[in-house]
């Protein structure tokens, strides 16, 4: 081996650092209480003590370039000198790669050797102390769980404000408390960890769930911000899913200021409140009285009471009631007045009049986010505008409402889910539909929203209510 080859090998160039030394100790404490003190470790390294602090940045760059500097996630290579007296004088060290050994100059690379030769550096042993705070959730849990559980370490959870909501698989249940404690320690802004309690697949009518608190206080009163609106609610009493923010935004972006939107299953208002904020009139219904209560809270918090009306009834009856009530509001001349921007003080222009926006006579969009069953409500559109063909005459320029109905279907790359969804819409609407352009009567646009299970996805189907359905006689 030539001298340069020896030097190369010694300096760690071309060699991967042995990073296993930074793994936490294996603490197979079982399902018992989490003992954070067991997660301490001393890693023996070498460090380049820098004689003059003004040279730190120069040597940091050089040693980084020659791959002699320690590169390890969440560890700064610049540390205080291990000698307390020198540290008190402000002396610093640069931590070196584990391949570099202080007593073995043949492991030092050219940059290090040169620094030592110039008496600007000295290479010293350094005992790096690592503890529980250093390691990630994954590191700690891997260290605790037995190896047969390493293949699918629980990592995902929903959050609602300070609450992390887990849905642990059966085989991780014995470790639920330890897992929750570590999540609590390692996730900023999480104060409570809960686990969904299996209720043998049965979902509650209001899409709430049974849970047990695994770590932190049993405090389910949460605050969240979504689409620039703030919500405060009891997460145990109403439905909330932070993973739907993009879907909420997608539909909100379709609504125009001054239009009317009827949200049939509005929850606490993640469609309604931001839509109201952009000047859309919203009739926001939910059958859960708790949702209705917290929607009112959100309306007040976000100052959208001029635009958003909370209603609490069965969505099936709401559909006709909403069409009638919007028309009534229009006939009564209900409107909002939008205060103009104050004129600049320099101009002595007369104060501009507020802008009046009337509630239009008809609904532009219905939203139905209750994916498990909403399609079954579609029969309720029959007769929604019975006797009101005039409202949608060619001269009026008005179109029948678009319905956006959420649903579940298969996960497949072909047309299977589209055809499945269209078949079910056909059945419940009582009118044949096929995949296509929602502006064409009898055609449906299907948007793929998100994965919900290995073989199941959530979709949103959008279509205009067919004339035959809208103008049918009410029974
Ligand atoms: C999946 S959540 C969606 C809530 C909200 N739209 C969202 O995106 O977060 C479905 C909502 O439907 C409400 N709900 C269930 N059955 C209903 C019915 N028959 N009529 C009206 N609302 C209903 C539940 O209370 C729940 O808030």
Swiss-Prot record:
Transmembrane segments: none annotated. One of its GO terms (cellular component) is mitochondrial matrix. It catalyses: guanosine(37) in tRNA + S-adenosyl-L-methionine = N(1)-methylguanosine(37) in tRNA + S-adenosyl-L-homocysteine + H(+). It comes from the Eukaryota. It is found in: Mitochondrion matrix; Nucleus; Cytoplasm. The keyword tRNA processing applies. Specifically methylates the N1 position of guanosine-37 in various cytoplasmic and mitochondrial tRNAs. Methylation is not dependent on the nature of the nucleoside 5' of the target nucleoside. This is the first step in the biosynthesis of wybutosine (yW), a modified base adjacent to the anticodon of tRNAs and required for accurate decoding. This is tRNA (guanine(37)-N(1))-methyltransferase.
């Amino acid at each position: 081996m030539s001298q340069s080859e020896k030097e190369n090998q010694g300096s760690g160039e071309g060699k991967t650092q042995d990073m296993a030394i930074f793994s936490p100790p294996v603490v197979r404490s079982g399902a018992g209480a989490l003992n954070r003190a067991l997660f301490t470790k001393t890693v023996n390294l070498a460090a380049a003590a820098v004689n003059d602090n003004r040279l730190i940045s120069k040597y940091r760059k050089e040693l980084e370039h020659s791959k002699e500097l320690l590169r390890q996630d969440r560890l700064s290579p610049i540390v205080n000198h291990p000698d307390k007296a020198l540290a008190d004088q402000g002396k610093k060290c640069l931590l070196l790669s584990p391949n570099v050994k202080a007593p073995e100059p043949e492991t030092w690379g050219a940059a290090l050797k040169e620094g030592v030769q110039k008496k600007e550096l000295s290479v010293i042993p350094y005992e790096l102390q690592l503890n529980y705070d250093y390691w990630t959730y994954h590191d700690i849990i891997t260290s605790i769980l037995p190896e047969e559980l390493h293949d699918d370490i629980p990592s995902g959870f929903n959050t609602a404000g300070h609450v992390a909501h887990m849905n642990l698989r059966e085989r991780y249940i014995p470790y639920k408390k330890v897992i929750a404690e570590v999540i609590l320690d390692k996730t900023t802004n999480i104060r409570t960890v809960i686990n969904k309690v299996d209720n043998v697949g049965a979902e509650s009518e209001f899409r709430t769930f049974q849970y047990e608190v695994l770590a932190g206080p049993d405090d389910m009163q949460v605050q969240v911000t979504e689409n620039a609106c703030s919500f405060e609610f009891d997460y145990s009493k109403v439905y909330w899913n932070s993973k739907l923010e993009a879907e909420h935004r997608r539909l909100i972006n379709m609504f125009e200021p001054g239009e009317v939107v009827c949200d049939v299953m509005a929850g606490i208002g993640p469609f309604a409140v931001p839509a109201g904020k952009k000047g859309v009139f919203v009739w926001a219904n939910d059958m859960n009285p708790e949702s209705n209560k917290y929607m009112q809270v959100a309306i007040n918090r976000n100052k959208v009471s001029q635009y958003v009306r909370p209603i609490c009834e069965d969505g099936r009856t709401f559909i006709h009631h909403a069409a009638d009530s919007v028309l009534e509001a229009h006939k009564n001349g209900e409107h909002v007045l939008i205060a103009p921007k104050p004129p600049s003080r320099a101009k002595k222009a007369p104060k501009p009049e507020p802008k009046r926006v009337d509630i239009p006579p008809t609904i532009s969009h219905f939203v139905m986010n209750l994916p498990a069953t909403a399609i079954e409500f579609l029969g309720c559109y029959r007769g929604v505008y019975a006797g009101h063909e005039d409202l949608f005459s060619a001269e009026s320029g008005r179109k029948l409402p678009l319905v956006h109905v959420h649903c579940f279907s298969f996960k497949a790359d072909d047309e299977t889910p589209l055809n499945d969804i269209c078949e079910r819409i056909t059945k419940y609407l009582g009118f044949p539909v096929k995949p296509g352009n929602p502006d064409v009567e009898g055609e449906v646009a299907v948007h793929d929203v998100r994965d919900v299970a290995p073989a199941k996805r959530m979709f949103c189907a959008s279509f205009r209510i067919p004339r035959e359905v809208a103008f049918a006689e009410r029974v």
